[in-house]
């Protein structure tokens, strides 16, 4: 029992001794505390100065940098835009006008052909035989007519001496007229047979592009069979629509006596495909869409347009003379409507409420609220307030600042990696 108590007493002494030595080891000395206090006292004025200086730098406000451009006065073309579909000027499904065996095809699929060019041939022999028969019948009846006319002349001479009765003379005259009618009928039969023979040669009704053939050589064709589709692409048309509110503008342009120019652009309105002119306008408005159809014609000599192709149409209907234009980037939208920031000679900005018109390229027509020759802010607009002074950057300076701003994160990232390593 006494041994156990002694053992616990010894352990307690060891713990107390360890705690004492630990306290002595980690406790700072008085000289260190004094030095630290002295250093703090000497450093405080400089640190406070630095804080005041840093605070002063954060409190200072530099003029925000902006880019500016001059408004100007110019003549601006006025375009109407619409979505159009290319249509062939003429389209025909070619049939055979006679029935028979298809003997030959004289075109290549997709080929451009001229008006009257031979496309295909039907077996002509049955029609040649029919023509010969008709010509033979005509020759026979013509001979009978000649003989009847000669007999009529004799009867007329004999009737003067009463050797031929009047009835015989009348009968002969009637026979001559009968043969004359027969000859006319035979002439019609010959012409019909000749026409059937001509129809065995199928030709192009106009200049155009041949489509895919729809029947092969050797087949028996009739007038109901489709041989091919021919489309006229030189020239070619585009059908497009404009809102009914623009009808008066289009009519005014048509009445000017000058062709109304029309441009066809690709789907993205990035590349012009062809230039043409307005051809006609429909005679009624589509009540479901509130638009009216117009047709424009293009020469299309380079085959830039193809039937059923979708294109964007720009039609020049007027030219606005001496209007004020400003960069579209400078025009903003707010509660009061469109506005623009204008710079005075002291590089101070003021907000002008404006009325905008049509947009032409990167410029917009300003019909009210801005004069030609005024400087307007095009970049840095989000930091502006009424009457604030700004720093107007030259284009080169603006580009360099933009480049520096873009490179700064990369520089900071490299520096951070260097410190980290």
Curated annotation (Swiss-Prot):
<protein>
    <recommendedName>
        <fullName>Multidrug resistance protein MdtA</fullName>
    </recommendedName>
</protein>
<keyword id="KW-0732">Signal</keyword>
<feature type="region of interest" description="Disordered">
    <location>
        <begin position="395"/>
        <end position="421"/>
    </location>
</feature>
<keyword id="KW-0472">Membrane</keyword>
<feature type="compositionally biased region" description="Low complexity">
    <location>
        <begin position="46"/>
        <end position="60"/>
    </location>
</feature>
<dbReference type="GO" id="GO:0015562">
    <property type="term" value="F:efflux transmembrane transporter activity"/>
</dbReference>
<keyword id="KW-0813">Transport</keyword>
<dbReference type="Pfam" id="PF16576">
    <property type="entry name" value="HlyD_D23"/>
</dbReference>
<keyword id="KW-0997">Cell inner membrane</keyword>
<keyword id="KW-1003">Cell membrane</keyword>
<dbReference type="GO" id="GO:0005886">
    <property type="term" value="C:plasma membrane"/>
</dbReference>
<dbReference type="InterPro" id="IPR006143">
    <property type="entry name" value="RND_pump_MFP"/>
</dbReference>
<feature type="region of interest" description="Disordered">
    <location>
        <begin position="34"/>
        <end position="69"/>
    </location>
</feature>
<comment type="similarity">
    <text>Belongs to the membrane fusion protein (MFP) (TC 8.A.1) family.</text>
</comment>
<dbReference type="GO" id="GO:1990281">
    <property type="term" value="C:efflux pump complex"/>
</dbReference>
<dbReference type="InterPro" id="IPR032317">
    <property type="entry name" value="CusB_D23"/>
</dbReference>
<dbReference type="GO" id="GO:0009636">
    <property type="term" value="P:response to toxic substance"/>
</dbReference>
<feature type="compositionally biased region" description="Polar residues">
    <location>
        <begin position="34"/>
        <end position="45"/>
    </location>
</feature>
<feature type="compositionally biased region" description="Basic and acidic residues">
    <location>
        <begin position="408"/>
        <end position="421"/>
    </location>
</feature>
<feature type="signal peptide">
    <location>
        <begin position="1"/>
        <end position="22"/>
    </location>
</feature>
<dbReference type="InterPro" id="IPR022824">
    <property type="entry name" value="Multidrug-R_MdtA"/>
</dbReference>
<comment type="subunit">
    <text>Part of a tripartite efflux system composed of MdtA, MdtB and MdtC.</text>
</comment>
């Amino acid at each position: 029992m006494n041994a156990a108590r002694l053992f616990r007493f010894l352990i307690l002494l060891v713990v107390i001794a360890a705690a004492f030595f630990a306290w002595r080891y980690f406790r700072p000395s008085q000289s260190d505390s004094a030095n630290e206090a002295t250093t703090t006292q000497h450093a405080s004025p400089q640190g406070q100065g630095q804080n005041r200086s840093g605070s002063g730098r954060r409190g200072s406000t530099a003029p925000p940098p902006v880019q500016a451009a001059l408004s100007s006065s110019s003549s601006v073309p006025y375009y109407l835009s619409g979505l159009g579909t290319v249509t062939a000027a003429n389209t025909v499904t070619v049939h055979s006008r006679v029935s028979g065996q298809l003997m030959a095809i004289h075109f290549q699929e997709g080929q451009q052909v001229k008006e009257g060019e031979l496309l295909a041939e039907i077996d002509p022999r049955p029609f040649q035989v029919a023509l010969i028969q008709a010509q033979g019948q005509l020759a026979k009846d013509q001979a009978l007519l000649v003989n009847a006319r000669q007999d009529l002349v004799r009867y007329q001479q004999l009737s003067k001496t009463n050797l031929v009765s009047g009835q015989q003379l009348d009968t002969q005259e009637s026979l001559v007229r009968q043969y004359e009618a027969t000859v006319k009928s035979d002439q019609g039969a010959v012409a019909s047979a000749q026409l059937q023979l001509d129809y065995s040669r199928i030709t192009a009704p106009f200049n155009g592009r041949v489509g895919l053939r729809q029947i092969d050589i050797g087949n028996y064709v009739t007038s109901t069979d489709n041989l091919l589709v021919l489309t006229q692409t030189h020239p070619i048309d585009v059908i497009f629509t404009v809102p009914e509110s623009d009808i008066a503008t289009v009519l005014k342009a048509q009445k000017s006596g000058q062709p109304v120019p029309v441009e066809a652009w690709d789907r993205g309105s990035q590349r012009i495909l062809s230039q043409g002119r307005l051809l006609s306008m429909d005679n009624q408005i589509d009540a479901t869409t509130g638009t009216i159809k117009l047709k424009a014609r293009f020469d299309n000599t380079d085959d830039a347009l193809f039937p059923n192709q979708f294109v964007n149409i720009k039609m020049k209907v007027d030219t606005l003379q001496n209007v004020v234009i400003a960069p579209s980037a400078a025009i903003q939208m707010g509660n009061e409507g469109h506005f623009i920031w204008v710079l005075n000679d002291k590089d101070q900005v003021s907000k002008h409420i404006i009325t905008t018109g049509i947009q032409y390229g990167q410029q917009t027509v300003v019909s009210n609220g801005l004069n030609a020759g005024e400087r307007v802010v095009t970049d840095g607009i989000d930091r502006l307030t009424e009457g604030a002074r700004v720093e107007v950057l030259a284009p080169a300076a603006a580009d360099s600042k933009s480049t520096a701003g873009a490179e700064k994160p990369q520089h900071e990232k490299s520096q951070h990696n260097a410190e980290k390593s």
